[in-house]
């Protein structure tokens, strides 16, 4: 009877051992760096010329964010580098991150050229420390990041005594003041990072820092839904290209819209999986180009549908599709080119950072948090969505008018009086029109800043899931209908 008990205890021990996280004792997660790509030498690891003993390393199976949330990731080795040297966090754009986790933005060369330093005070000790003698942790940008000039806090710091700071830990001293940057009162160490283009001015008398205001996560299951959506996109395109009667102007516009949305979804997935190293910026501009193109195609489809249904001439001339192409691709190119020029001109100017589109900084796409998104994304999208709603309303009114006329004529012929009656096919037709004409995309215009309210937060979540499944909805409404299957059988 003892052997089964021993086996049971052994199995439990293995389970708890495998599921436990090998945290480094006495080390904060934000004081660690990923050293999975560094080989072990003489019972230590060499990280940026800093020798870290193996006793200060451990395996982690999670990633911790500034808001305290944890995401499971692949098991990797981390080292408590801040136990060896004082640390400073400097932001690194997504476009400069390499596959091994290093940042290739020329920071080392700039530090060697300008030789910047900061003053540290801990308890009663003060020291002037060059940044080249510190452990530099390259921090990433997040969705709600905000650029802050450090002198904005000086007036507040003057009211706080030095004794309060000394109890709290690290202080950054300037020649004409002091600024606390670590724990407990203003910002935790994970809530900020220094801006890269800081050291050619009057640093450290003043500096620009990036404040991480929030951490966003991809909604559970949305990545899987996007993959299924892309499969449905491919199937829908194949059906529209296979059936000759669907290769009219409307069908071609739908195919172009789906292709644009497919490329946008593909870049989004690759960006989330960190597979765009080396091509982050080109991928980000391409994503914006095809995002705006798909929105423009929805407006073209809305206009063309209204034009065809309300026109006595139902013939679709080929030149009309060529005009649509010229309008969509040129407009999308102008929109993308404008944000490219803005980024190139003011990318290194911290004072204008908050208003930049920041392609390749937060992710490989245009940022979507700040009033400036109304210039680059939300404003144009709202205008196009409003146009789509207007076209749908005019089309629906026309269909209702025609249906009412037909019902009235039928009732007069049969000698009876009846109210206008819409059957299920009519409602299904309205549903298809609302989807094809992009009626629902107006909810996607809600900025993330407005989603801090609980109601708009839920509207945003529902909209995100629905539009992640947009390809599935299109496939069901356009391909799985009876008329499409009949055309497929006849082809």
UniProtKB/Swiss-Prot annotation:
State the membrane topology: Multi-pass membrane protein
Q: Its Gene Ontology molecular function terms?
A: G protein-coupled peptide receptor activity; G protein-coupled receptor activity
Identify the keywords attached in UniProt to this record, alphabetized: Cell membrane, Disulfide bond, G-protein coupled receptor, Glycoprotein, Membrane, Receptor, Signal, Transducer, Transmembrane, Transmembrane helix
User: What Gene3D superfamilies does the annotation carry?
Assistant: 2.30.160.11, Methuselah ectodomain, domain 2, Rhodopsin 7-helix transmembrane proteins
Which residue ranges does UniProt annotate as crossing the membrane?
168-188, 223-243, 253-273, 326-346, 373-393, 435-455, 459-479
Which PANTHER family does the annotation name?
G-PROTEIN COUPLED RECEPTOR MTH-RELATED
**Family the UniProt entry places it in:** Belongs to the G-protein coupled receptor 2 family. Mth subfamily.
Source domain of life is Eukaryota
Glycans attached where? 18, 42, 248
What protein does this entry describe?
A: Probable G-protein coupled receptor Mth-like 7
Leader sequence range is 1-22
Q: Which SUPFAM superfamilies match?
A: Methuselah ectodomain
Primary localisation category: membrane
| Topological domain ranges for the Extracellular compartment | 23-167, 244-252, 347-372, 456-458
Q: Note the SS bond partners.
A: 27-80, 82-87, 92-103
Topology: which residues are Cytoplasmic?
189-222, 274-325, 394-434, 480-491
Localization in the cell: Cell membrane
Q: Which GO terms describe its biological process?
A: cell surface receptor signaling pathway; determination of adult lifespan; G protein-coupled receptor signaling pathway; response to starvation
Pfam families per the UniProt record, alphabetical: Methuselah_N
- Gene Ontology CC terms: membrane; plasma membrane
């Amino acid at each position: 009877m003892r052997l089964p008990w021993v086996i049971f205890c052994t199995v439990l021990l293995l389970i708890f051992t495998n599921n436990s996280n090998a945290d480094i004792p006495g080390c904060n997660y934000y004081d660690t760096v990923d050293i999975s790509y560094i080989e072990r030498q003489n019972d230590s690891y060499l990280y940026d010329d800093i020798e870290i003993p193996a006793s200060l390393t451990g395996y982690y199976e999670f990633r911790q964010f500034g808001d305290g949330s944890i995401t499971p990731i692949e098991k990797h080795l981390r080292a408590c580098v801040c136990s060896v040297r004082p640390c400073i966090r400097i932001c690194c754009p997504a476009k400069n991150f390499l596959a091994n986790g290093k940042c290739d933005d020329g920071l080392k060369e700039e530090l060697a050229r300008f030789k910047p330093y900061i003053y540290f005070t801990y308890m009663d000790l003060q020291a002037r420390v060059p940044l080249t003698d510190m452990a530099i942790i390259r921090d990433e940008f997040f969705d709600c990041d905000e650029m802050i000039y450090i002198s904005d806090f000086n007036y507040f710091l003057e009211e706080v005594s030095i004794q309060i700071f000394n109890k709290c830990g690290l202080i950054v001293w300037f020649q004409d003041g002091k600024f606390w940057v670590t724990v407990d009162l203003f910002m935790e160490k994970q809530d900020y990072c220094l801006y890269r283009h800081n050291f050619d001015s009057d640093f450290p008398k003043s500096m620009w820092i990036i404040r991480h205001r929030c951490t966003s996560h991809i909604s559970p299951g949305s990545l899987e839904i996007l993959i299924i959506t892309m499969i449905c996109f491919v199937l829908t395109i194949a059906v529209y290209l296979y059936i000759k009667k669907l290769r009219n102007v409307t069908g071609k516009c739908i195919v172009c819209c789906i292709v644009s949305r497919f490329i946008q979804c593909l870049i989004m997935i690759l960006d989330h999986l960190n597979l765009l190293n080396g091509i982050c910026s080109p991928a980000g501009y391409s994503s914006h180009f095809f995002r705006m193109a798909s929105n423009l195609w929805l407006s073209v489809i809305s206009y063309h549908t209204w034009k065809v249904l309300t026109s006595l001439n139902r013939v679709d001339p080929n030149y009309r599709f060529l005009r649509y192409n010229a309008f969509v691709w040129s407009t999308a190119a102008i929109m993308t080119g404008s944000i490219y020029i803005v980024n190139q001109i003011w990318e290194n100017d911290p004072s204008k950072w908050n208003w930049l589109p920041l392609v390749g900084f937060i992710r490989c796409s245009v940022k979507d948090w700040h009033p400036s998104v109304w210039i680059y994304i939300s404003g144009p999208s709202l205008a196009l969505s409003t146009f789509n709603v207007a076209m749908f309303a005019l089309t629906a009114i026309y269909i209702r008018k025609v249906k009412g006329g037909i019902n009235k004529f039928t009732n007069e012929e049969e000698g009876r009086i009846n109210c206008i009656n819409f059957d299920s096919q009519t409602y299904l037709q309205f549903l298809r029109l609302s989807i094809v004409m992009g009626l629902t995309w107006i909810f996607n215009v809600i900025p993330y800043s407005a989603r801090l309210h609980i109601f708009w937060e839920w509207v945003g979540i529902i909209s995100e899931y629905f539009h992640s499944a947009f390809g599935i909805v299109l496939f069901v409404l356009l391909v799985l209908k009876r008329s499409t299957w009949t055309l497929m059988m006849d082809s």
